[in-house]
């Protein structure tokens, strides 16, 4: 994948949660392949694209997310964002008292309900210093914020994160596979480019990612397939773009990996 324009993190401190406004919203349009540089902050974040798919990278995982999903990033986690296509990005920042339970201390992908999508769009995306609010506007905003929290607590978590290793050799291999999801090379072929033997890489997959090469690749393909499904691509075209000779072979992979056929798995993409 060609590299795009690298962008700063767009002054997140100007949207920092406060006791008066513990939930903040930010809006930004990213061009195709634009990168938001790695950064971190002291508050939790929800990354959600209104249109277009994004890839969110942390040191431990990568998430490929279409508009019907969002990525939860706990406080203090270094992360970067890449626009897989032009996207209208929304970011929510959460004060420490919001969603502070144990389940919210790990990054994950969440399903976005139609109601949550509309609530995010309704939140004012104003940086500091924000203009004064009328009592009616403040009451409306607080009501929307309460509903956002309720919908997030109801949101279904999805196992769509793709774990990334610390070992430099395995990291090179994983990053290369992320760039070429439709390339159906075996571990022997990928090993030649990674600078390690297939046996070493197989061991590293188990030790660092707790999975096999084949299982990790299936998870990667699912993440890419979900993005294609969100664009309305037919199953046969998704299978072809991901390097499968037939839709039935792709269906078998999805069913084997998630326990259901793609028609069910992607029905809300």
Predicted regions and their residues:
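…primarily DNA-binding HTH/wHTH and HhH modules…
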Residues: 1-2, 252-269
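Short acidic-glycine-tyrosine-enriched beta hairpin
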Residues: 60-75
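Short hydrophobic/aromatic patch on the recognition helix
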Residues: 68, 201, 205, 249-250, ...
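Short, Lys/Arg-enriched, Trp-marked, Pro/Gly-tolerant hinge/linker segments that flank
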Residues: 106, 130-194, 207-219
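Alpha-helical residues within the helix-turn-helix
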Residues: 192, 203, 207, 240-241, ...
């Amino acid at each position: 994948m060609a590299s795009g324009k690298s962008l700063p993190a767009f002054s997140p401190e100007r949207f920092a949660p406060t006791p008066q406004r513990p939930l903040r919203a930010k809006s930004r349009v990213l061009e195709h392949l634009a990168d938001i540089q790695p950064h971190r902050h002291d508050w939790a974040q929800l990354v959600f694209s209104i249109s277009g798919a994004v890839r969110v990278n942390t040191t431990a995982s990568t998430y490929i997310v279409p508009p019907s999903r969002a990525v939860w990033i706990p406080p203090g986690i270094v992360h970067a964002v890449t626009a897989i296509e032009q996207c209208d990005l929304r970011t929510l920042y959460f004060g420490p008292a919001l969603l502070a339970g144990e389940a919210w201390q790990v990054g994950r992908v969440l399903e976005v309900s139609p109601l949550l999508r509309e609530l995010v769009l309704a939140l004012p995306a104003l940086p500091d210093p924000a203009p004064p609010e009328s009592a009616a506007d403040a009451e409306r905003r607080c009501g929307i914020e309460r509903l956002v929290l309720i919908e997030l607590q109801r949101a279904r978590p999805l196992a769509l994160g793709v774990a990334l290793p610390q070992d430099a050799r395995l990291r090179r291999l994983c990053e290369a596979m992320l760039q070429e999801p439709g390339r159906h090379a075996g571990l022997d072929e990928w090993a030649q480019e990674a600078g390690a033997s297939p046996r070493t890489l197989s061991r590293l997959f188990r030790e660092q990612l707790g999975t096999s090469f084949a299982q990790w690749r299936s998870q990667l393909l699912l993440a890419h397939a979900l993005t294609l499904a969100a664009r309305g691509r037919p199953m046969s075209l998704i299978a072809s773009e991901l390097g499968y000779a037939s839709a039935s072979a792709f269906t078998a992979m999805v069913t084997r990996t998630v326990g259901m056929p793609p028609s069910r798995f992607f029905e809300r993409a």
